[in-house]
A protein has these predicted regions:
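Active-site-adjacent structural elements that line small-molecule/cofactor binding pockets in enzymes
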Residues: 1-313
Length: 313
């Protein structure tokens, strides 16, 4: 049987339930129930009009109304660090190019300090070009290279020592970064994404991989690719933390980006089979997200997950 410590909970900080009291209460529930971690997605603003395609849906449309409430994840992490005591707090994922890399690193280091070393950085390159343009912090076309360099900067500033950096997209002369992060050499970095560049980024910069929206066939193929990259680079696959983020949608099955049934949608039996397959494929942790229409409904769904679904895994 699966252990609840194999599961994290995405708190849903965009959508109708993105309210401070609801988010804090759900975080406290997750800690009391025994979940290993709580997770936050990242958008700063949604442009009213955009042509960018969401990469994890069959239609390319974003799966939530863009005019719904939206909370910023780093500020929310700081609040949750003070509202909880033991549970880990992660981003799934933080869009690295959205923020100045030095300020981003210092904010995350500060939260790591206040939380007693409980943060995990799930890192992604982003997909919403129009949001990049609104924030005006990085060129969308260069987001992969920018992410790589910003992760290098993050790691160096976590050292708590004198740091300088001179890359292609960002440079600074020697600064003091004191204190460094509690977690050494830095808080764990999980690279989000399922394409080959993301897997290569896992090998070069990550402590693990954060996957989403993979059907069983592609899941197996992506893991085999990651194993091969580990062999080629001399890294141990067994040392990587593998995390899968799943949206739970009970009821009528939904279509995934390739027309297949979306993982996590359908009947209870189908959802249980999906979770068994994910855990059986080698993932260490599963981050679940229920979309409820109310705080009461979301709480009910999570109680059912912990009391009825997990014991069947």
């Amino acid at each position: 049987m699966a252990d609840i410590k194999q599961f994290g909970l995405d708190l849903g900080i965009y959508g109708p339930l993105a309210e401070p009291e609801i988010v804090i209460n759900l975080a406290k529930y997750a800690e009391t129930a025994g979940f290993s971690s709580i997770w936050l997605a990242d958008h700063v603003v949604f442009p009213k009009h955009f042509d960018s395609k969401y990469p994890y849906s069959a239609t390319g449309g974003f799966p939530a109304p863009i005019e719904d409430p939206l909370l910023e994840p780093i500020a929310t992490m700081a609040v949750l660090a003070g509202s909880t005591t033991d549970i880990r707090i992660g981003t799934a994922v933080l869009i690295i190019p959205y923020r100045n890399p030095v300020l981003l690193a210092r904010m995350l280091i500060t939260i790591d300090q206040f939380s007693g070393g409980r943060i995990t950085l799930g890192a992604g390159v982003g997909w919403l070009k129009e949001e990049f343009e609104t924030l005006n912090t990085a060129d969308f076309a260069l987001r992969g290279r920018v992410t790589d360099e910003y992760l290098e900067i993050f790691k160096s500033l976590c050292s708590g020592q004198e740091v300088s950096y001179h890359g292609e997209t960002y440079q600074f002369d020697t600064v003091y970064s004191v204190p460094g992060s509690i977690q050494k050499p830095n808080p764990p970095i999980l690279i989000g994404g399922i394409a080959n560049p993301a897997l290569r980024r896992v090998i070069k910069y990550g402590d693990g991989w954060l996957a989403v929206a993979l059907d069983p066939i592609r899941m197996k193929e992506r893991i085999e690719t990651l194993k091969k990259l580990c062999v080629d680079s001399g890294r141990r696959f067994e040392d990587l933390e593998l995390v899968y983020k799943i949206f739970i949608n009970p009821g009528e099955p939904k279509k995934g980006p390739f027309g297949e049934r979306e993982i996590g949608s359908g009947s209870e039996v189908q959802i249980i089979d999906d979770l068994k397959n994910i855990l059986g494929s080698g993932f260490n942790n599963v981050v679940v997200r229920y979309r409820g229409d109310s705080a009461k409904e979301q709480q009910k769904q999570m109680e059912r997950f912990t009391e009825e679904i997990i014991p069947k895994l």
